[in-house]
Amino acid sequence: MIVKNGYVWNGTIFEKKNLYIENGRFVPYSDTGPVVDATGLFVMPGWVDSHAHIIGTGMKVLTHDLTKENLFDIFKKIRESSENFIIARGWESLPEQQILDKANELKIPVLLVRKCGHVAWINNYLKEKIGKRKDENNLLFEKEIEKVWNFLGDEFFSKAFEKGQEEFLRHGVTQVHSDDFHGVGFETLKKLLKNSKIRIFEKLYTYEPWNYEFREFGISKIGGIKLFADGSLGGRTAWMVYPYKDTGGFGMNTLPDNFDEVVKFSEQRHIQLNIHVIGDRALAEVLGRLEKNKVKLRHRLIHLQFVLKNDFPKLRNFYLSIQPHFYFEDIPLLDNVSFELAYPFLQMHKSGYMIAFSTDSPVSPADPKYVLEYAFKMGFTREDAVYYYTEAGSKIAGYQCGKIDIGYCADFALYDNDPFEENPVAVFVNGEEVMRR
């Protein structure tokens, strides 16, 4: 393939040049294959989202978005629709009791998921279906929510996967480090990965990794193990050193009982751990446990919103998936917590740590421009921000992608306007066109 006359991002500026592609990679020269006329178009490496949820992003498209819809309207229309399971996501504070009472009157399952995805409310009908007692709370926290996903079925998850892919590709994202193993069957997940248009590094959420395959599936691979050390800040389940001012609680420790066993397995098999840590107490616990296990691999930590000063230097030994926009989204929540370091992402950059940007979609939009806007506000330069959203993310997954250069994966996008303001007109993954607007 030849991509002719495009303005190609070289890491600093756009320069006019031709690109040559063979076997899914950029090569010095080729005169075979199709010719893509990129005259007047900008050519960017495909964005790499180092932490998101493809199925979750698709579910947001297929279900109700509480930032755009009203629950009363949703319940009112239910009699006129064929909907037999109401899933709505996006609440910050629990809906009023009057609305919850309305949900409890319905004889179909109702699941209302908080924006963060770590807390959910279920109606009485669904509570009975998953085996909770009548006198138990209708709120579900963390791993409890997994019981509900098992009701949805693989056909639904397959549709959600397709919608999620479309959403990322629409924004020029060609690689996602995804966390999808929630309810979907493993055989179905393997098929989805094998046939994916997008390059996926799957972080398999399991406490029993020895029961699963870690290998390549098409252009994608199951390459990491996903674990949670705590929950979310807004849900008051992030595990903190100092108590939450409104509840007096410290959050939740969600590390599995067999954490050390999983660590040893990952070290023996050379599989990357991907550990969700938001609170400073969660991070301190994880760092201590990994040190105790004398890990030799460079594992990955995700989020890192609060860090103890003594723990900050230890982060040099890990890959760090961060979300600059979370600081700005979480400002209303910060008065409720005490901390030493909060969202020290620019400090990580200045210290030379191995960081990569991500959206955590569907918690936040799947659009890289959204993340970049807040990265610039935080103080990152355009050049550094692009690097952390392309090549850096690819490196921490073991791929040679995210850069338009000889030997790199031919994952790129074409834009007819400023790539930092508009979506692409076409997207290519592994040298194949996968999206055209």
Predicted regions: what they are:
Residues 53, 219-237, 318-327:
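Non-cysteine beta-strand/loop elements that form the S-adenosyl-L-methionine
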Residues 113, 178-181, 203-205, 223-228, ...:
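Generic beta-strand/beta-sheet core signal
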Residues 195-226, 298-305, 309-310, 333-347, ...:
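Phosphate/diphosphate-binding loops
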Residues 2-4, 9-10, 14-22, 26, ...:
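Divalent metal-binding segments
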Residues 192-195, 214-220, 264-268, 294, ...:
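Acidic (Asp/Glu)-rich catalytic clusters
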Residues 267-273, 288-299, 323-417, 428:
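His/Asp/Glu-enriched, well-ordered alpha-helical/loop segment
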Residues 13-15, 220-221, 420-422:
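Short, small/polar residue-rich loop motifs at catalytic or cofactor-binding pockets
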